[in-house]
């Protein structure tokens, strides 16, 4: 008998003032997998991610994470981390302060914060940049700070919304490899939104093809 999926979206729907956001979204995600939601702008992939994150609540359907019904749970109660297209860094804080900000909010002891930060900076290749502000970093370095912040959160589920779209083509290829290696090394489950077919095909174990607010096809890169 196979293990239960780590994440389940069961017939989820979202509408705004009667307008369709997503409809009939049903998806099982295995623990430790890398799942890409792929499709053009407006297809519902970011809405699906926001529903999973708890940033929006569905009008219909259920959402489960680790077997727990989180359909109406706040984002802070879903045990996940997020990496955004905009990086969402605090410009007045240093790299180190940005990385451990969430840990400070959660009142994690200082020694533990420092240990987790050192490990995250090592993994993301940011050692030596601890005191720099985001404005002093390249786009690729800023994205690595956002990744380091997700790593120190220590969550087993990480949601990524078009995290590479602000980078140039050469950097995208480099950071793409970094993200995939991190996911494998840490054994985390990643749900990754992108409109870039190459990105999805090169990173994901499973691709969810979306159009007009609905899932069109689900399969491995080879199957699609």
Predicted regions and their residues:
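A short, proline-enriched helix->beta-strand linker immediately N-terminal to the Walker B motif
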Residues: 152-156
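Short coil-to-helix segment of the ABC ATPase nucleotide-binding domain corresponding to the Q-loop/switch region
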Residues: 93-101
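The feature captures the beta-strand-to-loop junction immediately N-terminal to the Walker
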Residues: 38-40
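Conserved ABC ATPase "signature" region
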Residues: 69, 100, 104, 111-129, ...
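Conserved ABC ATPase signature
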Residues: 133-137, 141-143
């Amino acid at each position: 008998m196979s293990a239960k999926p780590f994440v389940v979206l069961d017939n989820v729907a979202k509408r705004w003032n009667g307008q369709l956001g997503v409809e009939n979204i049903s998806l099982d995600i295995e623990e430790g997998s890398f799942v890409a939601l792929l499709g053009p702008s407006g297809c519902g992939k970011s809405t699906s991610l926001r529903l999973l994150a708890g940033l929006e609540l569905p009008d219909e359907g259920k959402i489960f994470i680790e077997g727990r019904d989180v359909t109406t749970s706040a984002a802070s109660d879903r045990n996940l981390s997020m990496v955004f297209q905009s990086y969402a860094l605090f410009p007045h804080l240093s790299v180190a302060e940005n990385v451990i900000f969430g840990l400070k909010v959660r009142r994690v002891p200082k020694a533990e914060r420092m240990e987790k930060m050192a490990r995250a900076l090592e993994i993301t290749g940011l050692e030596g940049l601890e005191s720099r502000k985001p404005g002093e970093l390249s786009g690729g370095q800023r994205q690595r700070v956002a990744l380091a912040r997700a790593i120190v959160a220590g969550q087993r589920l990480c949601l990524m919304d078009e995290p590479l779209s602000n980078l140039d083509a050469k950097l995208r290829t480099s950071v793409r490899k970094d993200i995939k290696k991190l996911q494998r090394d840490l054994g985390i489950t990643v749900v990754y939104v992108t409109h870039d077919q190459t990105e999805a095909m090169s990173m994901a174990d499973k691709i969810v093809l979306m159009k007009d607010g609905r899932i069109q096809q689900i399969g491995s890169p080879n199957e699609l």
